[in-house]
């Protein structure tokens, strides 16, 4: 049994989330590109560049086949991604296998012949068609993203949920607009007709990611320290909050843009099981329903992009995807909770960890041991 002295929670980069599903990439240097989501180029131990076809992406919302009761391929319980359901037995039951490194993999179905216990530890991921903001850093009080960008929380939320625009670039000859200005949908439409092509205003999680990635943290830290010398008491409190977040990012290896996600981790299937009941019905955890919503909306958005759908339609679908990810991470913090029958709110990842009945206090802490 492994012993842990402490646990540290940080922000996971897209590369780290992808490496959880691809152990060959752990500890390796590579860059994940959402546009080329199927392949990555990494640097091996000898310093050579190698290309790897990624595995572990959950593409379908299906769980189990209703006829065979076996996991659907590329679904939420896929044996290729998460490992076999029975010890040393692949999905097709054939004995044909080939050696891939240290692993035994069936040539026909691609399932690794190993212990079924790996289904408790192997992770998958969902590659998102559009970035989404992590709700912990947006909605929790105080909002880390709002403080870091020196904006009001309401303004950031309106941009994330595509209700407002923020001016990114503007020509010098336009006096009515300035970078960082918040515009409503109607105002942006008016200015677009008046100054078409002479300014740039964007919305959505992509905009927040762009703003966060362009922050010069060292420069911001120096500016805040200078401002603190002459600031009033009320202003000082606000500046100190911002300084603490900036210093925390500089001291850690985390980057501000990681608060906007291109990839979502899918936890192992044995931690969100489906149980067969009498009469052929299944009982399942709420997490599977929350993941299913994300995959459905993500697939629909990807198809809309491929078809070249109008901006109005894709914007609405992006908002639905953001709301689906919010519900998965923290359903209780949302104004309109995602619920099932009898209006029971679905239990999100945060709800599983939080409170007296949460995983930490109920299962891990305060236990008598021999």
Please provide the spans of the model-predicted regions.
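Conserved core architecture of multi-subunit DNA-directed RNA polymerases
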Residues: 1-370
């Amino acid at each position: 049994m492994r012993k842990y002295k402490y646990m540290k929670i940080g922000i996971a980069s897209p590369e780290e989330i992808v490496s959880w599903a691809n152990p060959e990439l752990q500890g390796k240097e590579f860059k994940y590109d959402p546009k080329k989501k199927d392949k990555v180029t990494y640097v091996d131990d000898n310093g050579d560049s190698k290309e790897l076809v990624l595995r572990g992406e959950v593409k379908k919302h299906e769980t189990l086949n209703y006829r065979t009761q076996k996991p659907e391929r590329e679904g939420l319980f896929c044996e290729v991604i998460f490992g076999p359901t029975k010890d040393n037995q692949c999905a097709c039951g054939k004995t044909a296998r080939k050696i891939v490194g240290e692993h035994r993999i069936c040539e026909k179905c691609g399932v690794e012949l190993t212990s079924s216990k790996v289904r408790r530890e192997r992770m998958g991921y969902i590659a998102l068609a559009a970035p989404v903001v992590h709700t912990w850093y947006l909605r929790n009080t105080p909002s880390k993203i709002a403080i870091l960008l020196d904006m009001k929380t309401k303004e950031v939320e309106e941009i994330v949920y595509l209700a407002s625009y923020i001016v990114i670039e503007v020509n010098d000859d336009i006096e009515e607009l300035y970078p960082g200005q918040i515009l409503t949908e109607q105002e942006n439409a008016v200015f677009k007709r008046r100054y078409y092509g002479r300014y740039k205003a964007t919305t959505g999680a992509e905009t927040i990611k762009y703003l966060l990635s362009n922050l010069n943290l060292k420069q911001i830290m120096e500016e805040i320290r200078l401002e603190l010398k002459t600031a009033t008491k009320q202003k000082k409190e606000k500046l100190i909050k911002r300084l603490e977040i900036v210093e925390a990012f500089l001291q850690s290896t985390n980057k501000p843009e990681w608060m906007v996600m291109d990839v979502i981790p899918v936890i192992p299937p044995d931690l969100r099981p489906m149980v067969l009941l009498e009469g052929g019905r299944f009982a399942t955890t709420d997490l599977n329903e929350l993941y299913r919503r994300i995959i459905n909306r993500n697939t629909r958005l990807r198809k809309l992009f491929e078809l070249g759908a109008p901006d109005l339609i894709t914007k609405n679908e992006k908002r639905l995807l953001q709301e689906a990810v919010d519900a998965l991470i923290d359903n209780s913090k949302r104004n309109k909770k995602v619920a099932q029958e009898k209006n029971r709110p679905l239990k999100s990842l945060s709800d599983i960890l939080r409170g007296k009945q949460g995983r930490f206090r109920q299962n891990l802490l305060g236990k008598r041991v021999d």
